[in-house]
Structure formats: C-alpha cells, structure tokens
A protein has these predicted regions:
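N-terminal cap/lid segment of alpha/beta-hydrolase-fold proteins
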Residues: 1-25
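The serine-hydrolase catalytic nucleophile loop
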Residues: 37-49, 64, 172-173
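Conserved alpha/beta-hydrolase
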Residues: 49-69
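Catalytic nucleophile-loop/oxyanion-hole region of alpha/beta-hydrolase
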Residues: 65-92, 203
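Catalytic histidine-centered segment of alpha/beta-hydrolase-like enzymes
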Residues: 71, 196-207
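Primarily recognizes the serine-hydrolase "nucleophile elbow" in alpha/beta-hydrolase
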Residues: 84-147
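Short beta-strand/loop motif that positions the catalytic acidic residue
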Residues: 154, 160-162, 166
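Acidic catalytic loop of the alpha/beta-hydrolase fold
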Residues: 165-169, 199
C-alpha cells in the first residue's frame, strides 16, 4: 500500500507522520496512536496501519512531541492527536469519516479524543489504562483527566481490544470502560486476542488483532 510522509502542525512544532493510503479511494481516515515510551515504527503500529489501508481506510501514525517519559503527558498527547485529526480532515484524499485507534497510553488519549470530538465515528482502545497507575507517571499531576467518564459522552462506536497475555494493563480496565459505556448506551464491544501480550506479539496474535481492528473500523466508518 502507498504511504507518504506528512508534517502535523501542533502549536509551534511540526510532528513527523506517515500516512498509509489504500490502493483505491479511502472510505475514511484514522489516527493511530502509540503508547507511552513507544514510537510509531513499532511492529504492532505499522501492522495496524497497513491492515487499515488494505481495508480501504487511510491510517496516520506519528510520533508525539515528547514521547519518552517523563515529559510526555495527557495534555501534550491530546494536543498532538487533535493535530493528527485536523490533518486527516483537511487531506484531499480522505473523506470526513474519522476514527482513532490507540494502544496503551495512546488508547487513553484516544478515549479523550473520542469523548471530545463529535466527528469521531469509531474509537479503538487497545490495552488502554482506565485510570493512572504506577507505570504512568505522566498522569501524576493530571487528575482532571477522567478517560472513562469522557469516553461515555462519545458519539462513536467503541472497540476494546486486549491480549490474553497482557501483564501490564489488566483486563479489568476493559471491563471498567465497557460497564460505563453500556450504562451510557454507547455501542461497545470487547475482543480478547488469545496469546497476545501488551503489544499483541507474537506474529499470530498480532495479525488477528490487526484484522479485528480493521474490519471493525471499516463497519464503524461506513
């Protein structure tokens, strides 16, 4: 699938991004957000973008301004993700059917984006913390952010994806999101990827995850 380098303007900074485009005209566009301390070239991020493009969806991956601890925060991550959504909305090859996919910390950012931006039709939270934990010091002074409550206000459909071998973000986080979403009557679904770890390795579970995410997102954006 073709891809192109893009610059994402956020405040006084330009973020480096890669836009994966389908072979035919896209049905919509999705921002794909990596995790805390990760980067957009990680195998599960690239594989997800490739599979989305094969499903007819333009997929944008990028590096946050401060993507290493301790400088990365939900404030900065949310602003960067909003910049990615703006780029997708303005791109001539991307119809205004928008979604967001986030992994780990990026999933928490995705929850905030989907809760605040009414243009988002589909949101995927993959191994996303529902509340601050010891591994997420970026939240230490950000008690104002309540991702579960904010996501409950979304107009989007929500997919919650977890690996059965994830030893970093317990499955109870998915259940917490789902309980509040269901109470708010937000359409949601939980999918467990058997054998997948926090990054959905090894290759077999990763392929199952990307197929699940891309197929679900295609329906959400239709």
């Amino acid at each position: 699938m073709p891809s192109q380098r893009v610059g994402i303007r956020v405040e006084d900074t330009e973020l480096d991004g890669v836009l994966h485009l389908p072979a035919a005209r896209a049905i919509g566009g999705v921002a794909v957000l990596h995790g805390f301390g990760g980067d957009p070239s990680q195998p599960h991020i690239v594989a997800t973008c490739d599979e989305l493009a094969r499903a007819g969806i333009a997929a944008l991956r990028f590096a946050y301004r401060d993507h290493q601890p301790p400088r990365m925060t939900l404030d900065s991550g949310l602003a960067d993700a909003a910049g990615a959504i703006r780029l997708l909305k303005a791109h001539p090859d991307v119809p205004e059917r928008l979604g967001v996919v986030g992994f780990s910390f990026g999933g928490t950012v995705a929850a905030l984006v989907a809760g605040r931006d009414s243009r988002i039709r589909g949101a995927v939270l993959a191994a996303a913390p529902a509340a601050p934990g010891p591994s997420f010091t970026a939240w230490s002074n950000e008690g104002k952010w309540k991702p579960v409550a904010e996501l409950s206000r979304t107009r989007a459909r929500v997919l919650l994806v977890w690996g059965s071998r994830d030893d970093q973000v317990p499955f109870e986080n998915a259940e917490r999101y789902a309980a509040v979403l269901s109470q708010a009557r937000v359409p949601n679904r939980i999918v467990t990827i058997e054998g997948g770890d926090h990054d959905f390795a090894p290759a077999g579970p990763r392929a199952k995850m990307t197929e699940t995410v891309a197929g679900w997102m295609r329906e959400a954006l239709a």
